[in-house]
Amino acid sequence: MLNIGPFSFHSRLLLGTGKFPDFDVQQKAIDVSEAEVLTFAVRRMDIFDAKQPNLLEKLDVKKYKLLPNTAGAKNAEEAVRIAKLAKASGLCDMIKVEVIGDDRTLLPDPVETLRASEMLLEEGFIVLPYTSDDVVLARKLQELGVHAIMPGASPIGSGLGIVNPLNLSFIIEQATVPVIVDAGIGSPADAAFAMELGADGVLLNTAVSGAKDPIKMAQAMKLSIEAGRLGFEAGRIARKRCATASSPLEGMSVVE
């Protein structure tokens, strides 16, 4: 089970809802992924305008836990305003904090992410901050009392996979809250690797919505995350420089 604050989920795949070709493909991809947590940008949908197409009208909101994010925020105050807007609309008070500090790389602003997380915790939100793979920043966020850490594998939407597995492993080793790898996942192999490192979950969007067949990719991601978790729990063999025979040599007779 993936436990985030008071919530428990069977699936360790969290799925973003943006950039799908249409609602039908989106819904089918969500279904086959078996994701229980869906994330979306509050600023990308007018949740108070009944005339606008609305994801919330298409989904069975009782079936999923919706995770609004603060994408578009440039500082802590903007992030808090977006979070309060989501809560006022009747959504869950679980929020993904996303405060971008650089428009080219879309990397998070560490100072504003810390500030926003602290402010939202004081407001009673369940806080999941998107952060870089900075080990010290992850620890400071954890010390604030956030409910999960969401380090990026690589820049958002890049599909580069995990570019710094060492830092990611350090974050996982020191964590006392769930670590959900977020951003940069490009393939099922990337997702499996994140889970093999010991991550508690993976959040992805573009890898599915941008695939040639989003529905098949959603299923592939589901299976790879399950396989990666099983592999982590099973425990991989140690890496060694020299070969070790897999068949015993003792007792074998030599035919001359």
From Swiss-Prot:
This is Thiazole synthase. The active site is at residue 96. The keyword Cytoplasm applies. Keywords: Cytoplasm, Schiff base, Thiamine biosynthesis, Transferase. It catalyses: [ThiS sulfur-carrier protein]-C-terminal-Gly-aminoethanethioate + 2-iminoacetate + 1-deoxy-D-xylulose 5-phosphate = [ThiS sulfur-carrier protein]-C-terminal Gly-Gly + 2-[(2R,5Z)-2-carboxy-4-methylthiazol-5(2H)-ylidene]ethyl phosphate + 2 H2O + H(+). It comes from Bacillus anthracis. Its main location: cytoplasm. The keyword Cytoplasm applies. Its EC number is 2.8.1.10. One of its GO terms (molecular function) is thiazole synthase activity. Pathway: Cofactor biosynthesis; thiamine diphosphate biosynthesis. Pfam families: ThiG.
